[in-house]
């Protein structure tokens, strides 16, 4: 082996096997691109992304760790979400969750109060 050499294993790596998934249609209603990382609690993404936020509670993008999805202004695209593992204790950067994802009504109420598009669809 050469120092620094990477020798990936052959074959396909499966991620998030056995976890519940959902597809959601997301529209960027803002005037700037928005990028969302792989493990960001999806209900807490930028308030200018419009989608059914209730469907995103306890979910993150079903993409490889360390990657992201970019939404251009005016763009609409379907993404797949996957549930978080473990005890579903999530602390989002917009303080909608702050702990358990099992308090859906409280999380949605905070999203509505904060002007997050798509939260009012509950």
From Swiss-Prot:
Q: Its family?
A: Belongs to the urease beta subunit family.
Cellular component, GO annotation = urease complex
Q: Name one GO molecular function term.
A: urease activity
Q: Name one Pfam family in it.
A: Urease_beta
**UniProt pathway:** Nitrogen metabolism; urea degradation; CO(2) and NH(3) from urea (urease route): step 1/1
UniProt main location, coarse: cytoplasm
The record's EC number reads: 3.5.1.5
Q: Which UniProt keywords apply?
A: Cytoplasm, Hydrolase
Show the InterPro entries listed in the entry: Urease_beta-like, Urease_betasu_sf, Urease_subunit
Superkingdom of source: Bacteria
What's the subunit arrangement here? Heterotrimer of UreA (gamma), UreB (beta) and UreC (alpha) subunits. Three heterotrimers associate to form the active enzyme.
State its location(s).
Cytoplasm
Q: Please give the name of this protein.
A: Urease subunit beta
Catalysed reaction(s) here are: urea + 2 H2O + H(+) = hydrogencarbonate + 2 NH4(+)
């Amino acid at each position: 082996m050469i120092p620094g050499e990477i020798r990936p294993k052959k074959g396909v790596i499966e991620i998030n096997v056995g976890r519940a998934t959902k597809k959601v249609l997301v529209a960027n209603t803002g005037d700037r691109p928005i990028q969302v990382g792989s493990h960001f609690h999806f209900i807490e993404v930028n308030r200018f992304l419009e989608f059914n936020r209730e469907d995103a509670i306890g979910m993150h993008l079903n993409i490889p760790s360390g990657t992201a999805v970019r939404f251009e202004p005016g763009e609409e695209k379907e993404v797949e979400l996957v549930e978080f593992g473990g005890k579903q204790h999530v602390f989002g950067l917009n303080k909608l969750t702050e702990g358990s994802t099992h308090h859906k009504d409280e999380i949605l109420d905070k999203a509505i109060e904060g002007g997050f598009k798509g939260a009012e669809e509950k």
